[in-house]
Curated annotation (Swiss-Prot):
Transmembrane regions listed in the UniProt entry: none
Cofactor: record remark: Binds 1 zinc ion per subunit.
Protein name as annotated: Succinylglutamate desuccinylase
NCBIfam families named in the record: arg_catab_astE (TIGR03242), PRK05324.1 (NF003706)
Function: Transforms N(2)-succinylglutamate into succinate and glutamate.
Domain of life: Bacteria
Sorted UniProt keywords: Arginine metabolism, Hydrolase, Metal-binding, Zinc
Single GO MF descriptor: hydrolase activity, acting on ester bonds
Amino acid sequence: MLALGKLLELTLTDHEPAEKTQVTPKGVRLRWLGEGALEVRPPEGDDCGLDLLLSAGIHGNETAPIELLERLLHGVANGKIKPRSRVMFLFGNPAAIRKGERFIEQDINRLFNGRHELSSGFEALRAAELEQFARVFFSKPERARLHYDLHTAIRGSKIEQFALYPYKEGRKHSRRELARLAAAGMEAVLLQSKSSITFSAFTYEQLDAEAFTLELGKARPFGQNEQVNLDKLEERLIQIIEGNEPEAGDSLDGLKLFSVAREIIKHSEGFRLHLPVDIENFSELSKGYLLAEDLAEMRWVVEEEGARIIFPNPKVKNGLRAGILIVPDSGQRLD
C-alpha cells in the first residue's frame, strides 16, 4: 500500500511525509496537501466529473467516522477501490484527534462562515485552514460538488443515524440528495432554515456544494466502534468514489424529515435546561413543557405539536445554541 494511504497514522504521529505525491499502478494520484488533508485524483480520462469532500474528526473524540475514512483511503491506496471521482480526505482537528478530546480550546464546528475571524487560538486558525482547503478543492468549474462531514454524537439518540441539511436563501433542498442519503442508511434528515456556522454550512452556502453533516451514532474511543454499523454508508461511499452509484430515484419512503422550530440560545450563566442529563436526541416533548429558562425571566415553553429535542447542551458558551427544537416536516418545499 502507498505510504500516503496511511493519512491517519501520519496525523496521529504529527508526521509530514517525505514524498508528497504518489501514484498507484492504475494511475490514481494521491497528493498530501497539509496536515490531515489528502487529495485523490482518478486516472486521466476516467473522471466521472464529481468532486467529493469527506471530512471527519472535526471533533477529535468522534472516532467511528475517522476509522471509516481510513478504511476508504486504504482501499484507494492498495487498489481495491478504483476512483473515478476526485476526492479529498480531511481530518478536521488533528490536535484534538491526537488527544482523543472533542476540542483543544473551543468547538471548531462553531467557527466557520467567517466566525473564526472573530476569534483566536488554535481552532480558529484551523477553521480558516479548512475553509481554504475546501475553497481550493471546489474551485474547478462545471463539476458536481458533494461534501459529507461525518460525526458521532456526545449522547445517545432515538434515531441513531441522521443528517443535517444546511440552508441558503433562494436555494431549495434536493429530493435526489435526500434519496441518496436514505440509500446510505440515514434514517432522518433535519432541513435547516437559517444560515449556520458549521463546516457543512460553509461549503453549502459559500462553495455551492451539496453538503451535509452526518451523525452516525455515539462517540467512542478508537477501536471501540463495533456497535456503530456504517456498512450501508461505506458501501454507498465506495460506489460514489468509483462512479458506479445505483440511481436512488426520488423516493423518500422510510426517511423521516424534520425542520427547525426554534433554537435554544444560552445568553448567560443563569441558563437552565430542564431536561435529564442523559436525554437522547429526538426525544419527544409535550406541549406546555418548560424546556429552559435564562435571566430576565426568559423562558422556552414547548408550543409545537410533535416537538423533539436534539443536541441539548447547557455547557456551551454564552451566545451559542444549547439545543434545537424540531418538528416533523412534510417535504413539500423540496426541489
